Swiss-Prot record:
Organism the protein comes from: Danio rerio
Protein name: COP9 signalosome complex subunit 9
GO terms under cellular component: chromatin; COP9 signalosome; cytoplasm; nucleoplasm; nucleus
Keywords: Cytoplasm, Nucleus, Signalosome
Family: Belongs to the CSN9 family.
Length: 57
């Protein structure tokens, strides 16, 4: 027996909707821009080049 949606997500569906209901991809992009997250000011960005294959041994 598969759990019902309200059993899996008791807090509700949240901001997630079908693309058909959101008005297509443009509505989805607007939702993404409205829900943009900010990086903490103390975030230490020392990742160098993650896609640099020259240093693979």
């Amino acid at each position: 027996m598969k759990p019902a949606v309200d059993e899996m997500f008791p807090e509700g569906a949240g901001p997630y909707v079908d693309l058909d209901e959101a008005g297509g991809s443009s509505g989805l992009l607007m939702d993404l821009a409205a829900n943009e997250k900010a990086v903490h000011s103390d975030f230490f960005n020392d990742f160098e080049d993650l896609f640099d294959d020259d240093d693979i041994q």
